[in-house]
Amino acid sequence: MDSSSGGAGGGGGAQIKGMGTHGGRYVLYNVYGNFFEVSSKYAPPIRPIGRGAYGIVCAAVNSENGEEVAIKKIGNAFDNHIDAKRTLREIKLLRHMDHENIIAIKDIIRPPRRDNFNDVYIVSELMDTDLHQIIRSNQPLTDDHCQYFLYQLLRGLKYVHSANVLHRDLKPSNLFLNANCDLKIADFGLARTTTETDLMTEYVVTRWYRAPELLLNCSQYTAAIDVWSVGCILGEIVTRQPLFPGRDYIQQLKLITELIGSPDDSSLGFLRSDNARRYMKQLPQYPRQDFRLRFRNMSAGAVDLLEKMLVFDPSRRITVDEALHHPYLASLHDINEEPTCPAPFSFDFEQPSFTEEHIKELIWRESLAFNPDPPY
């Protein structure tokens, strides 16, 4: 299971005992043949629960408060500038966020030595599973489940967008769940502020949930990219299959237009690039499918909301706030229980001239914020 964001996966995994290091201040484990060294308050045993693209995840208990946590090890975190920047960005963002539907960061384990550390250990709240696992399981999902998952996702996203942040990588495996069906958004490593323009060329992003404007390399994208991803997730909850499982960008756009219809000239106005407009016009033309026939198992309200999310032109796509007011979510929606972020997030800590050593110093400081030197 890919729990690479470090929160999901309460079940499974053998317990592993460790040995004390650094005068008993730390405990060293051997997990899948990898060293896993954490502060001693995370008392043995620990339990491996996942291996993701960015490292190993273990479940543990904080002996100081009895809290169950997930600890994600990012090994050799500073070998690659892009990955180092991604790790710092996620730590800073999660520390800025404080919302029931966003995974909470609990600790950055302070390395034993400032001058000699290469691994980063991020501690977050432990969740039971993720939406990808649930969709792939045999567990029946009712319309009530669908409503509740969607409502929580939009509620968390409202908070994220109010901080001037775009998530940019929403997908079922980044949405963690517990046994009560409480949902939390995770993995902010690709997030950006709404004012930044970046074609995401640095990263391999999951293509299936990407909005048309990103597939067409539109640099002036908005919060609407996340709404498109939510629409893809909504459709997948009901059908139990990805809506647009494209093998490449060309097939991805083909699958999209086969469902929502080929865009007319007025729907291509947002594209600044003549090449992108020409490309879309020379593709095979498809009529719009009837969503009620395509999604027969979906309630009428869910179909209506899905149609408003899967709109080619981002300026015509429903916003998160409008979606929360949609009749489909009326039984859950309460404006007084949908908070916004008190302060916008800033990526000012990221300087183009930053080396891996600069990033290492900033992550060290983050670990000190959680684990300050004792007063003498």
Swiss-Prot record:
Keywords for this protein: ATP-binding, Kinase, Nucleotide-binding, Phosphoprotein, Serine/threonine-protein kinase, Transferase
**Residue limits of the Protein kinase domain?**
43-329
Reaction catalysed? L-seryl-[protein] + ATP = O-phospho-L-seryl-[protein] + ADP + H(+); L-threonyl-[protein] + ATP = O-phospho-L-threonyl-[protein] + ADP + H(+)
Q: How is the activity of this chain controlled?
A: Activated by threonine and tyrosine phosphorylation.
Q: Which InterPro entries match?
A: Kinase-like_dom_sf (IPR011009), MAP_kinase (IPR050117), MAP_kinase_CS (IPR003527), Prot_kinase_dom (IPR000719), Protein_kinase_ATP_BS (IPR017441), Ser/Thr_kinase_AS (IPR008271)
Active site residues per record = D169 (proton acceptor)
Q: Where is this motif: TXY?
A: 201-203
GO MF terms here are: ATP binding; MAP kinase activity; protein serine kinase activity; protein serine/threonine kinase activity
Report the domain of life of the source organism.
Eukaryota
**PROSITE patterns reported for this sequence:** MAPK (PS01351), PROTEIN_KINASE_ATP (PS00107), PROTEIN_KINASE_DOM (PS50011), PROTEIN_KINASE_ST (PS00108)
- Give the enzyme's EC designation: 2.7.11.24
**Residues where ATP binds:** I49, G50, R51, G52, A53, Y54, G55, I56, V57, K72
Tell me which Pfam families the record gives. Pkinase
Q: Does the keyword Zinc apply?
A: no
Cytoplasm listed as a keyword: no
On this chain, the residues bearing Phosphothreonine are T201
Any single Gene Ontology cellular-component annotation? nucleus
Write down which residues bear the modification named Phosphotyrosine: Y203
Choose any GO biological process term that the UniProt entry carries and state it: intracellular signal transduction
PTM info: Dually phosphorylated on Thr-201 and Tyr-203, which activates the enzyme.
Instruction: Please give the family membership noted in the entry.
Output: Belongs to the protein kinase superfamily. CMGC Ser/Thr protein kinase family. MAP kinase subfamily.
The record comments on the domains as follows: The TXY motif contains the threonine and tyrosine residues whose phosphorylation activates the MAP kinases.
Q: What is this protein called?
A: Mitogen-activated protein kinase 6
Tell me the gene name. MPK6
